[in-house]
Amino acid sequence: PMSDGASMLILMSRKKAIELNINPIAKIINYDDSSVSSELFTSAPSTSIKKLLKRSKTKINSIDLFEINEAFAMVPLLNMDILSIERNKVNINGGAVSLGHPLGCSGARILTTLIHCLHQNNKTNGVASICNGGGGASSIQIAI
């Protein structure tokens, strides 16, 4: 379901965090923006995740948790199948169908959810990915 939402994420360099004595809750390892043909938009996250992990030289089975946005319930299921990701690693607290799909801040919602899930489950690395219209997808790899 669509839901109202507002969010803010603060990004800063390690140097600035040290200067301000701020303890970051996560570190960005890498990111990717990719696209596929618009009729294949539901599979776009898998393309983006593959490119992201290749660039960061990370094996998919070394990622602890994934958040894959689900404007449609089948999106994470399809991408789990394409990437051979275990179900217990994806959207472990539910996805947008159960938590809401906040118009305009879905990326911030899934990234924040991923960070908290990693902390709550004593995990250290994760990937968040989202379809962003017209066949595009964005993914980010983080560590805590």
How does the language model describe each region?
Residues P1-I144:
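Claisen-condensing/thiolase-fold acyl-transfer catalytic domains that form or cleave C-C bonds
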